[in-house]
C-alpha cells in the first residue's frame, strides 16, 4: 500500500554485505510494496529529500514529494557488489502497464491510491534521470516488486534477467525439453500476466522453438488469457474440481491430489487421441 516499504529488503542486503557477500542473486516479485525501492535504498544509506531539503520517510506515499537524494552515507560495500536480479515480469516503472496500475490493486490499493503511487513513480523516475542521467521509465522489469527492479537498475551494479532464464541455464532445461512429446508447466493463477515474462511463458517459448505442445495447469484460469497462446502455450486447465475455499485449494495434500487428478485426465485424453 502507500506506506509499505522495502526497508527490510535493504536490511538483508546490508547484513550480507557486512558479512562479506559481494555477488547476489535476488528474486523480486510477489511483494506487498510499491515504494520504488526507496525503503531498500534508505536502509543502505540513501537519504531522500523534499523541495525544502527535508528528509522524507521512504514509502510509496512520499514518492511524489522527492526532489533530490543524498548518497554520502551509503555503504561503500554497495559499490563493490554485483546484483543479478531474477525478475519474472516485464512491466515498466510507471504508466498503464507499470507497477502501480498492474499490481497496486492486488496489494489492496484503491483507484485513488493507485493514481498517487503512479504519479509518485513518474516523479521519482524523473528525479533519477535528472541526477543520475539514467532513464528507467521503460526498462523491461523496472516496475517489478513495486519498482524495486528500477531501483536496482538505477542505483546498483545490476542486471535484470528473467528468473526463468537463470533457472533454465542452471538446469539446462532447453536440452531436456528438446525431444519431448509434451511439456507441462503452470503456476498458481494463469491470467494475462502469465505471458508477461513469467515462468509459464519462459518454458513455452523454449518448447515453441521445437514445435512441442505446452499444457499449463493452474489453481485458477482467468477468462482473458488469449495472449498466452501467442507465446506457445497450447491449452490451460484449472485443477479445481468442485466448489472450495482458497484455503482448501491451497492445502498441500489437497493441491497435490488436484494436480495429479487433472494431469491424469489430460493424459487420458492424449492417450485416447493417439489410439485414434
Where are these regions (language model features)?
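N-terminal loops that bind phosphate or other acidic moieties
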Residues: 1-28, 32-276
Amino acid at each position: 500500500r502507500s506506506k509499505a516499504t522495502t526497508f527490510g529488503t535493504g536490511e538483508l542486503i546490508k547484513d550480507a554485505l557486512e558479512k562479506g557477500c559481494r555477488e547476489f542473486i535476488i528474486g523480486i516479485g510477489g511483494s506487498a510494496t510499491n515504494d520504488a525501492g526507496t525503503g531498500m535504498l534508505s536502509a543502505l544509506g540513501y537519504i531522500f529529500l523534499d523541495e525544502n531539503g527535508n528528509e522524507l520517510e521512504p514509502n510509496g506515499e512520499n514518492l511524489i514529494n522527492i526532489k533530490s537524494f543524498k548518497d554520502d552515507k551509503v555503504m561503500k560495500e554497495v559499490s563493490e557488489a554485483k546484483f543479478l536480479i531474477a525478475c519474472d515480469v516485464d512491466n515498466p516503472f510507471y504508466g498503464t502497464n507499470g507497477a502501480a496500475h498492474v499490481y497496486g490493486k492486488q496489494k489492496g490499493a484503491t483507484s485513488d491510491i493507485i493514481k498517487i503511487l503512479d504519479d509518485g513513480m513518474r516523479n521519482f523516475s524523473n528525479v533519477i534521470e535528472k541526477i543520475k542521467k539514467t532513464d528507467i521509465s521503460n526498462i523491461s522489469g523496472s516496475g517489478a516488486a513495486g519498482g524495486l527492479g528500477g531501483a536496482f537498475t538505477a542505483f546498483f551494479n545490476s542486471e535484470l534477467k528473467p528468473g526463468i532464464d537463470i533457472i533454465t541455464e542452471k538446469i539446462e532445461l532447453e536440452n531436456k525439453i528438446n525431444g519431448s512429446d509434451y511439456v507441462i508447466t503452470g503456476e498458481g493463477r494463469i491470467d494475462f500476466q502469465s505471458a508477461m515474462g513469467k515462468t509459464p511463458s519462459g518454458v513455452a517459448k523454449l518448447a515453441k522453438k521445437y514445435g512441442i505442445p505446452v499444457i499449463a495447469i493452474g489453481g485458477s484460469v482467468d477468462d482473458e488469457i488469449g495472449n498466452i497462446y501467442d507465446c506457445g502455450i497450447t491449452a490451460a486447465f484449472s485443477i479445481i474440481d468442485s466448489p472450495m475455499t482458497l484455503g482448501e485449494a491451497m492445502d498441500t495434500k489437497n493441491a497435490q491430489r488436484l494436480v495429479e487428478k487433472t494431469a491424469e485426465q489430460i493424459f487420458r485424453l492424449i492417450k485416447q487421441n493417439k489410439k485414434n
